[in-house]
Amino acid sequence: MSNILDCLREGEEVEVKGPSGEIRYLGHGRFEVDDNERRFDNVTLILGGSGVTPGYQIIARILNTPDDKPRVKVIDANKSENDILLSSELEDFARNHCEQFQIAHVLSHPSDKWKGLKGHLNEDVIKEHAFEPAEGNVALLCGPPTMIQKAALPALRDWGYDDDRNLFGF
């Protein structure tokens, strides 16, 4: 989306639709998903591009709530280092909440200096950096439709995650 917005000229208009689903964090592992309360101990967030922004709200709420216990793993997919939004805030969380929070960035077009994951989001990246599909675990997705539809959803479903039980998009 940011690539499209960069190309707009002053005065041009954009129609925006969203959000399609509602996920709210209520505290202490409790989530409200489309008006139903659910409880999860381990949260995987698979985010891409500007999708990190709503994901960040959930992360911050969990990590900044005293005595909140859910563990969070994030896979953040971008093109390059310059495209990673909220980079310093996420790295601060990783440093200050290392027992509760982990983040893996995967870049499709990194610089030669990049030492992290390279390529596109795929099943191997997901299985290495996400919580396995078990009771009390959830995967939440927000990112470009192609990444979600072609990579994240098939890999998570094949692994054992189920739509509307422990697999949700927002």
Name each model feature, range by range:
Residues G11, G51, P144:
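Short, conserved phosphate/pyrophosphate- and ester-handling motifs at nucleotide-, phospho-/glycolipid
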Residues F40-D41, L63-V72:
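Conserved S-adenosyl-L-methionine
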Residues V43-L47, L141-P144:
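Catalytic cysteine-centered active loop of the rhodanese-like fold, especially the PTP/DSP P-loop
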Residues P54-P66:
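Histidine-anchored nucleotide/phosphate-binding helix
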